[in-house]
């Protein structure tokens, strides 16, 4: 008889968390591809941002009759990822030293960009005038209007749009009867502006549905060395397979040659990790090949390195 599903044993909350984690990992991998950072290479930090539509939340709260959107716990998403030891699992899967979780509530682009700024995410607002919407109102002064708008602090524009639903822009209007000009203004609404954001230098991001990932692309020497350790371990593991060694057998020595002097020094701090990953008793690092050792030449990031194992 086939076993029957015991639904009472299913932890639906835990299932939902892992579904969310799958999406997070997929987005993180997309961000890595943009930055050309391999999955094996550790990165210093990531920010995971969950976007919640206000209307959806209000409808949900009306159905539950429990709380309004502005009472929503901003740390709930972080709590979900922290319980049941999920945090360490996610950190390992993302291959990141640390991550933070943010949650923003938004109903339009203005609020989305503002919320990201207020959440201290690495973004900069991008706002420009939609010429075809504004030109009919200011006619020949469109150039002056655009020029004046470029001088304005874009965060101030966002706050004003959120509170007043419009932004009043003052500019010098050309006179039809003389060379002088007079002060004038135009009220700009969200429909008159193209609003988006860019990611600050040193970061890359990926977005899907209601999730965004911001990943630091800055890699110091320690992170670069850790990435090299992962690459070398993978190639030495492959060499073990090619030589048909028993996967559980602890071999004598792994050799890594054609290294730079500083690489020998930095990798020597990670020999414990390498011996564990490759299952050998010792690691020999050198700038030049050792005599009487048969090496295999591999390529890592466009350069040749020689490895051997026995």
Sequence positions of predicted segments:
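Feature 926 captures the class I aminoacyl-tRNA synthetase adenylation module centered on the KMSKS loop
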Residues: 1-310
